[in-house]
């Protein structure tokens, strides 16, 4: 079992409440296979992986927001392409 010290992660995010929200959001992405881990998994649970990513500065809310905007844009473009094929 991995032990994670969250003090460094708190310093990256700002406060422990935002850290909890950010780590939960990232862990959900990892668990549902929407994203690949940015650190070695080492047989850790998604929450531990999320905390390690945050601690290393690889993930924060701004990064996840940008990824989600990019995903939404790509999905919108794919839907537009599908509609244009159906109406052509």
UniProtKB/Swiss-Prot annotation:
Keyword terms: DNA-directed RNA polymerase, Nucleotidyltransferase, Transcription, Transferase
Source organism, top-level taxon: Bacteria
Substrates-to-products reaction catalysed: RNA(n) + a ribonucleoside 5'-triphosphate = RNA(n+1) + diphosphate
InterPro entries: DNA-dir_RNA_pol_omega (IPR003716), Pol_omega/Rpo6/RPB6 (IPR006110), RPB6/omega-like_sf (IPR036161)
SUPFAM superfamilies linked to this entry: RPB6/omega subunit-like
Protein EC: 2.7.7.6
Regions annotated as coiled coil: none
GO BP: any one term: DNA-templated transcription
GO MF entry, a single one: DNA binding
Group of enzyme by EC: transferase
GO cellular component, one term: DNA-directed RNA polymerase complex
Family, similarity comment: Belongs to the RNA polymerase subunit omega family.
Subunit structure: The RNAP catalytic core consists of 2 alpha, 1 beta, 1 beta' and 1 omega subunit. When a sigma factor is associated with the core the holoenzyme is formed, which can initiate transcription.
Chain's role: Promotes RNA polymerase assembly. Latches the N- and C-terminal regions of the beta' subunit thereby facilitating its interaction with the beta and alpha subunits.
Name of the protein this chain belongs to: DNA-directed RNA polymerase subunit omega
């Amino acid at each position: 079992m991995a032990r994670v010290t969250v003090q460094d992660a708190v310093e990256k995010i700002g406060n422990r409440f935002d850290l909890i929200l950010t780590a939960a959001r990232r862990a959900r992405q990892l668990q549902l296979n929407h994203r690949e881990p940015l650190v070695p998994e080492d047989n850790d649970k998604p929450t531990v992986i999320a905390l390690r990513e945050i601690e290393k500065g690889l993930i924060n809310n701004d990064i996840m927001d940008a990824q989600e905007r990019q995903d939404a844009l790509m999905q919108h473009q794919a839907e537009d392409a599908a509609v244009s094929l159906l109406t052509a």
